[in-house]
Curated annotation (Swiss-Prot):
Protein name (database record): DNA mismatch repair protein MutL
SMART domains cross-referenced by the UniProt entry: DNA_mis_repair, MutL_C
GO CC annotation terms, alphabetical: mismatch repair complex
Gene that produces this protein: mutL
NCBIfam families listed in its UniProt record: mutl (TIGR00585)
Role played: This protein is involved in the repair of mismatches in DNA. It is required for dam-dependent methyl-directed DNA mismatch repair. May act as a 'molecular matchmaker', a protein that promotes the formation of a stable complex between two or more DNA-binding proteins in an ATP-dependent manner without itself being part of a final effector complex.
Assigned keywords, A-Z: DNA damage, DNA repair
GO molecular function annotations of the record: ATP binding; ATP hydrolysis activity; ATP-dependent DNA damage sensor activity; mismatched DNA binding
Family designation: Belongs to the DNA mismatch repair MutL/HexB family.
GO biological process terms on file: mismatch repair
Length: 582
């Protein structure tokens, strides 16, 4: 086939695929345009997950009638001059958003600047542009997108359900609302108001987005180094979520999901929170524009810093100083476990039920409630060593997290108590579910949990199936759900934290996944809630009970997330490590 130039329509549709890969991307681009136009109030309406209709209205400067045809041309912008590319101060600068949206759907732009007698409208349908026409309208701009991706039907095959796409749109608006707290924001999804925020300061906006109960627990941070300043709010190590979607980072007013910043936050919390948990964070970074390259990602979500090490160090130091305050010391572990390169042990063989009294107690009593008995502080006699115990007898507990045992052949065994108990809890919950339904424990005082509208929709949409897992949830007015019962095995769990984690799990799983598979992920999340935590001191009887139960549990060599629960060190391994082996 000979080389030929592509026609403009095909070029626009290819470019649209890079810029507008889903409805949330269109919402983000349109709201950024409104902010760049100096809007003090922005309204967003979503219908059908953003595939049916997106509307963004603002009271900004507006577009003159004569410039409307230019506004929907590719690489036409009022935000950039030739010499300003290295000092970008606006959210948008490429001139790609409107033409990309117009190439993918049906785009209508209605705008009126101050001083213009009436508004003007231009329509783009699948790349075809209609004539500008005068219409009535207030000062500002209204952009409507309908039937998104009708011109590129292949793109629709890769979209998730309308509810999930609406949730992603809402997340995008929330991130932008945090980036610009001085601007009022409203969001309506399928006719229902999701939120309506007046202009606020940062603290008020954080409380509106995260909920006042969580916002009151957040720690304020501030750090300045030369020309770089970091300010914001983070959660103590005792307040975490099941997903990282509650982390919002803003650089020079631009909401980003930059890997360097996210990694710095993760490193700051690394030895303070369990694996699989994520802190809450709302952070604003101010840095000279010439020290930042924002033109490195199609969605402008990632950045390139001139001094990445300095930025990383600033964030890690600021977060760790805040976490070291007296309010958070109780949640921080006193000793950290050094990293090793030991491989996980080979899969554990299945053994007959052990006859120890501790094992019977664990299997018959503790697995029923999935709660280890309180640790005793009185001196105890070590259990008698038995050569037929694959995991041996416990010798000690290391860092209040790992059980050290010795098997009959002299092998040292290390067991992660949380990961191991999590697997046992998960197996117990699965057995109850497969036998019909997981028993529910009604709460004496039902718990009211405030949540975003899209999380409420996810929970209520799966409410009937969640009831089969023992979690009974119902609507409770606007912006909240009522938790009436939790799985009996999780009777002591925090119902509000459980509901939030289940909502996060449903959101993170993606709605392309079958509900049954999602519920599997929910069940694993539930198991994590009731498992004995790292940092909990165990008595020898408790340690032995856990080891004996592991020996009779399938898949006990890994936790539900695939991490190892057991590591083994033979005498030969130790001799090689100490240089004794020939």
């Amino acid at each position: 086939m000979p080389i030929r130039r592509l026609d403009p329509t095909t070029i626009n549709r290819i470019a649209a695929g890079e810029v507008i890969e889903r409805p949330a991307a269109a919402v983000k681009e349109l709201v950024e345009n409104a902010l760049d136009a100096g809007a003090r109030r922005i309204g967003v309406t979503i219908e059908g997950g953003g595939i049916g209709r997106i509307e963004v209205t603002d009271d900004g400067h507006g577009i003159p009638e004569a410039e409307l045809p230019l506004a929907i041309e590719r690489h036409a912008t009022s935000k950039l001059t030739d010499e300003a590319l290295v000092r970008i101060a606006t959210l948008g600068f490429r001139g790609e958003a409107l033409p990309s949206i117009g190439a993918a759907g049906r785009l209508t732009v209605t705008s009126r600047p101050a001083g213009q007698d009436s508004a003007a409208r231009i329509v783009v349908d699948g790349g075809a542009v209609r004539e500008v026409e005068p219409v009535a309208g207030p000062v500002g701009t209204c952009v409507t997108v309908e039937d998104l991706f009708h011109a590129t039907p292949a793109r629709r095959k890769f979209l998730r359900s309308a509810g999930s796409e609406a949730g992603s749109c809402a997340d995008a608006v929330r991130h932008l609302a945090l980036a610009a707290p001085a601007v009022g924001f409203s969001l309506t999804i399928d006719g229902a108001a999701s939120f309506d925020l007046p202009p606020q300061d940062r603290r008020e906006r954080v409380a509106a987005i995260y909920g006042r109960a969580d916002a009151e627990k957040l720690l304020e941070i501030e750090a300045v180094r030369e020309e770089v300043a970091l300010r914001g709010f983070i959660s103590p190590a005792s307040l975490t979520r099941a997903a990282a979607r509650h982390q919002h980072m803003v650089v020079n007013g631009r909401p980003v999901r930059d890997p360097l910043l996210r990694m710095a936050l993760r490193l700051a919390y690394r030895e303070r929170i369990p694996a699989g948990r994520h802190p809450l964070a709302a952070l604003w970074l101010e840095i000279p524009a010439e020290m930042l390259d924002v033109n490195v990602h199609p969605a402008k979500a990632e950045l390139r810093f001139a001094t990445p090490d300095a930025v990383r160090s600033l964030m890690i130091g600021a977060v760790q100083r805040a976490l070291a305050t007296p309010a958070d010391l109780a949640a921080a572990p006193s000793v950290s476990m050094p990293r090793t390169s030991w491989a996980a042990s080979s899969p554990m063989p299945r053994y007959p039920q052990a006859e120890s009294r501790a094992a019977r107690g664990f299997a018959e009593a503790e697995l029923r409630g999935l709660d280890l008995p309180p640790a005793r502080v009185a001196p105890e006699v070590l259990p008698e060593s038995r050569p037929d115990y694959p995991l041996g007898t416990p010798i000690a507990q290391v860092f209040d997290t790992y059980i050290l045992a010795q098997s009959g052949d002299g092998t040292l065994v290390l067991v992660d108590q949380h990961a191991a108990h999590e697997r046992l809890t998960e197996i117990r919950l699965r057995a109850e579910r497969d036998s019909g339904a997981i028993p529910a424990q009604a709460l004496l005082a039902p718990s009211v949990v405030e949540l975003p509208a899209e999380d409420i929709a996810r929970l209520l949409g799966a409410a009937e199936r969640l009831a089969g897992l023992g979690l009974e949830i119902e609507a409770f007015g606007p912006g909240a759900v009522l938790v009436r019962a939790v799985p009996a095995a999780l009777a002591k769990a925090d119902p509000a934290a459980l509901a939030r984690d289940v909502a996060d799990t449903l959101a993170e799983s993606g709605t392309a996944m079958a509900l049954e598979a999602k519920l599997d992920a929910v069940l694993i999340r539930m198991a994590c809630h009731r498992s004995v935590r790292a940092g909990r001191r165990l008595a020898f009887a408790e340690m032995e009970a856990l080891l004996r139960a592991m020996e009779t549990t399938p898949l006990a060599q890994t936790c539900p997330h695939g991490r190892p629960t057991v590591l083994r060190l033979s005498r030969g391994d130790l001799e090689r490590m100490f240089g004794r082996a020939g």
